[in-house]
C-alpha cells in the first residue's frame, strides 16, 4: 500500500548499523527517515557528512535520523568506517540494511529499473503520521537547510496550530486557521485584514 501524507507511517523492524530498531521505538519523537541510492557513492557521501554535521540541529528539535538503503549491513559498516577514516566524521544515526527491500517497497522507495533505493525523505510526527515527503533525482543532493526549515514549520503547526506562508522562516508570523462562520469572516474584514481568508498571528 502506498504511503500518503497524513496517514500512519508503516511500522518496521530492521537491522541497522546501531543494532535492531523498530519505528515504534520512536513514538513521541519526530523521525526523519531518508533513503540513499547506494553506499560508497559521491552524492550520498556528501549527504551523510552534512547530516552528521547538522546532527545536533536535528536533536535539538527532537528529531531522530534514520538512514536506509538496500545495501548489506557489512557494506554500511565499511562505508561509514571509510567516512570516519577519510573525513573524520562519525555517523551517529542508524542506517537500515534493507537487503530484501521490504521497507523500501512499503515506503515506495525502490527504483524498479535500477533495483536500488531512490533519494527520498519522510518526516514522521510523534503520532507516527507521515507529515512531509519528497524525492530527489539521483543526481541531485538534498538541501539540509530546507529539510530543517520544513521540520520547524511542521512543529510550529503542531504546537501553535498555524500554517506557514511562502518562504516562512522561524520567527516569522504564521497564518491562522480560516474562519468557521460568516461572522468570523466579516470580523476579519472589519479588523482591517486585506482578505477574510488570510490572517496572520
From Swiss-Prot:
Note: The active site is a conserved redox-active cysteine residue, the peroxidatic cysteine (C(P)), which makes the nucleophilic attack on the peroxide substrate. The peroxide oxidizes the C(P)-SH to cysteine sulfenic acid (C(P)-SOH), which then reacts with another cysteine residue, the resolving cysteine (C(R)), to form a disulfide bridge. The disulfide is subsequently reduced by an appropriate electron donor to complete the catalytic cycle. In this 1-Cys peroxiredoxin, no C(R) is present and C(P) instead forms a disulfide with a cysteine from another protein or with a small thiol molecule.
Catalytic activity: a hydroperoxide + [thioredoxin]-dithiol = an alcohol + [thioredoxin]-disulfide + H2O
One Gene Ontology molecular-function label: thioredoxin peroxidase activity
Assembly description: Homodecamer. Pentamer of dimers that assemble into a ring structure.
Source organism superkingdom: Archaea
Active-site residues, record numbering mapped to chain: 44 (cysteine sulfenic acid (-soh) intermediate)
Enzyme class: oxidoreductase
Gene Ontology CC terms: cytosol
InterPro entries for this protein: AhpC/TSA (IPR000866), Peroxiredoxin (IPR050217), Peroxiredoxin_AhpC-typ (IPR024706), Peroxiredoxin_C (IPR019479), Peroxiredoxin_TDXH (IPR022915), PRX_1cys (IPR045020), Thioredoxin-like_sf (IPR036249), Thioredoxin_domain (IPR013766)
Every Thioredoxin domain range: 3-156
Protein residues bound to substrate: 119
Compartmental location: Cytoplasm
TM segment ranges: none
GO annotation terms (biological process): cell redox homeostasis; cellular response to stress; hydrogen peroxide catabolic process; response to oxidative stress
Described purpose of this protein according to its UniProt entry: Thiol-specific peroxidase that catalyzes the reduction of hydrogen peroxide and organic hydroperoxides to water and alcohols, respectively. Plays a role in cell protection against oxidative stress by detoxifying peroxides.
Keywords: Antioxidant, Cytoplasm, Oxidoreductase, Peroxidase, Redox-active center
Annotated EC: 1.11.1.24
Annotated protein name in UniProt: Peroxiredoxin 2
Family: Belongs to the peroxiredoxin family. Prx6 subfamily.
Amino acid at each position: 500500500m502506498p504511503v500518503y501524507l497524513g496517514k500512519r507511517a508503516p511500522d518496521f523492524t530492521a537491522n541497522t548499523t546501531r543494532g535492531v530498531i523498530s519505528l515504534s521505538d520512536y513514538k513521541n519523537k519526530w523521525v526523519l527517515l531518508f533513503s540513499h541510492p547506494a553506499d560508497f557513492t559521491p552524492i550520498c557521501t556528501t549527504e551523510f557528512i552534512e547530516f552528521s554535521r547538522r546532527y545536533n540541529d536535528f536533536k535539538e528539535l527532537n528529531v531522530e535520523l534514520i538512514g536506509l538503503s538496500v545495501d548489506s549491513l557489512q557494506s554500511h559498516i565499511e562505508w561509514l568506517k571509510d567516512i570516519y577514516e577519510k573525513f573524520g566524521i562519525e555517523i551517529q544515526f542508524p542506517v537500515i540494511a534493507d537487503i530484501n527491500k521490504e521497507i523500501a517497497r512499503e515506503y515506495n522507495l525502490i527504483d524498479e529499473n535500477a533495483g536500488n533505493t531512490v533519494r527520498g525523505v519522510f518526516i514522521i510526527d510523534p503520532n507516527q503520521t507521515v507529515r512531509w515527503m519528497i524525492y530527489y533525482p539521483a543526481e541531485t543532493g538534498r538541501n539540509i537547510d530546507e529539510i530543517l526549515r520544513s521540520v520547524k514549520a511542521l512543529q510550529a503547526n503542531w504546537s501553535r496550530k498555524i500554517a506557514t506562508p511562502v518562504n516562512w522562516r522561524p520567527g516569522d508570523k504564521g497564518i491562522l486557521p480560516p474562519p468557521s462562520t460568516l461572522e468570523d469572516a466579516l470580523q476579519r474584514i472589519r479588523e482591517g485584514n486585506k482578505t477574510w481568508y488570510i490572517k496572520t498571528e
